[in-house]
UniProtKB/Swiss-Prot annotation:
This is 5-methylthioadenosine/S-adenosylhomocysteine deaminase. PANTHER family: AMIDOHYDROLASE-RELATED DOMAIN-CONTAINING PROTEIN (PTHR43794:SF11), AMINOHYDROLASE SSNA-RELATED (PTHR43794). Substrate binds at E94, R150, H189, E219, D304. Disulfide bonds: none annotated. InterPro entries: Amidohydro-rel, Deaminase_MtaD/DadD, Metal-dep_hydrolase_composite, Metal_Hydrolase, MTA/SAH_deaminase. It comes from Bacillus cereus (strain G9842). The lineage of its organism: Bacteria, Bacillati, Bacillota, Bacilli, Bacillales. Its cofactor is Zn(2+). Belongs to the metallo-dependent hydrolases superfamily. MTA/SAH deaminase family. It holds the Pfam family Amidohydro_1. Catalyzes the deamination of 5-methylthioadenosine and S-adenosyl-L-homocysteine into 5-methylthioinosine and S-inosyl-L-homocysteine, respectively. Is also able to deaminate adenosine. Keywords: Hydrolase, Metal-binding, Zinc. Binds 1 zinc ion per subunit.
Length: 435
């Protein structure tokens, strides 16, 4: 099946960050086979031609760190620091989860993400009360591209920890794939919730199965102090000593990193999922993304969970990310719009090991989203496309979402998930949680 999308303004995110006016994209099954400007002559003998009527077309957004199973916890635990938020709000509520509630919560997060333009994401879920196979089936049904990882903790007894490692290894062996729509990573929660033995086992599983690692690291000053007091090393050095960085690793946050650590992480291909809104809301601080990029680190933007954000709007994250860097450095040139867009598209895709997506180029997967600026005053005049995408647009502006060549959202309507049912069930299950 060949489909051509014509009469579009195309934000390619190629090496030149080229914006093509009055262009077209040809998709064959799940791949982009041509991207050009001008009138379409049907040289490829396509099956369908769709007039985009001047819509902006850009790569699907890539969210590098989420917790979609937590989506029912939106608004619970506002105005709290990370540790009390986890210990008195999030973990007690997660302990009440059932398989049915976890699916309803996941569906809500997936619906919010895809309708706001996210096409790919990397997720960590707490396995307590969760049917992991049902979660993977739910993500698959959504049509999204994802790395969904089972989180490991050292809570309970040593036997509990051993069982957690065994279950996580089975999960990795079942779901890890080098390519395709769904995969997984090895995901120890953090250095403050995992023993040294567990982190070493996670490193072993990652090496033996050739997977990536996903971990919360250097998120707060308290974490750095506590790990240094307990192990005599800062979190980065401690994680390295456990062998975690033998495989490409995504660290969520990286708020508290010094110059030497940034250089070390760049050398060891450790990437950062930058969560600006979540870090601000939890009072964790502001990650120095400008310095990370200057050190050669790979960085991708993320939302974290709705419990700490409180939405999954990647446009908002792009805007906050660039404004924060300008503010903390007192440098208006820090993190310009092209860089912010890169960190939410092709750069983010590289961070989570999905190089097949993130830009609109021949050979890439057909993952793209559209915005119709014609009826939106906040996107007018419509000629400054890149600026408007970062500084003015929001997820609510999305018209269409195409993932792997399939129309997942069309004219604002999700084709893969039952929006009315999901919203109804979210409210019903939320009422059952004991706060």
């Amino acid at each position: 099946m060949k489909t051509t999308y014509v009469n579009a303004t195309i934000v390619t995110m190629n090496e030149q960050n080229e914006v093509i006016e009055n262009g077209y994209i040809i998709v064959e099954n799940d791949q982009i086979i041509d991207v050009k400007s001008g009138e379409f002559a049907n040289d490829f003998e396509v099956d369908e031609v769709i007039d985009m009527k001047g819509k902006w077309v850009l790569p699907g957004l890539v969210n590098t760190h989420t917790h979609v199973v937590m989506s029912l916890l939106r608004g619970i635990g506002d105005d709290m620091l990370l540790q009390p938020w986890l210990e008195t709000r999030i973990w007690p509520l997660e302990s009440q989860f059932t398989p049915e509630l976890a699916v309803a919560s996941t569906e809500l997060g997936l619906l919010e993400m895809v309708k706001s333009g996210t096409t790919s994401f990397s997720d960590m879920f707490n396995p307590i009360g969760v049917d992991q196979d049902a979660i993977m089936e739910t993500v698959s049904r959504s049509g999204m591209r994802a790395a969904v990882s089972r989180t490991l903790f050292s809570f309970g007894t040593k036997d509990d920890e051993k069982k957690a490692i065994e279950e996580a290894e089975k999960y990795v062996k079942r779901y890890y794939k080098e390519s395709g729509m769904l995969t997984t990573m090895v995901a120890p929660h953090s250095p403050y919730t995992c023993s040294t033995e567990l982190l070493e086992e996670c490193a072993r599983i990652a090496v033996e199965n050739q997977t990536m690692v996903h971990i919360h690291l250097s998120e707060t000053e308290r974490e750095v102090r506590d790990i240094e007091a307990q192990y005599g090393k800062r979190p980065v050095e401690y994680a390295a000593s456990c062998g975690l960085f033998k495989r490409p690793t995504v660290i969520a946050h990286g708020v508290v990193l010094n110059e030497n650590e940034r250089a070390f992480l760049a050398e060891h291909d450790v990437r950062v999922a930058h969560n600006p809104n979540s870090n601000l809301k939890l009072g964790s601080g502001i990650a120095n993304v400008k310095a990370m990029l200057e050190a050669g680190m790979k960085v991708g933007i993320a939302t974290d969970s709705v419990a700490s954000n409180n939405n999954l709007d990647m446009f908002e994250e792009m805007r906050i990310a660039t404004l924060l860097q300008k503010g903390i450095h007192q440098d208006a040139t820090a993190l310009p719009v092209e860089t912010a867009l890169t960190l939410a598209t092709k750069g983010a895709a590289e961070v989570i090991g999905m190089k097949q997506t993130g830009s609109l180029e021949v050979g890439k997967c057909a993952d793209f989203i559209t915005i119709d600026p014609s009826n939106k005053p906040h996107l007018q005049p419509a000629d400054e496309v890149l600026s408007h995408l970062v500084y003015a647009a929001s997820g609510k502006d999305i018209s269409d979402v195409i993932i792997n060549g399939k129309r997942v959202v069309w004219n604002g309507e999700c084709k893969t998930l039952d929006e009315e049912r999901i919203i109804f069930e979210a409210s019903r299950y939320k009422r059952g949680l004991q706060r």
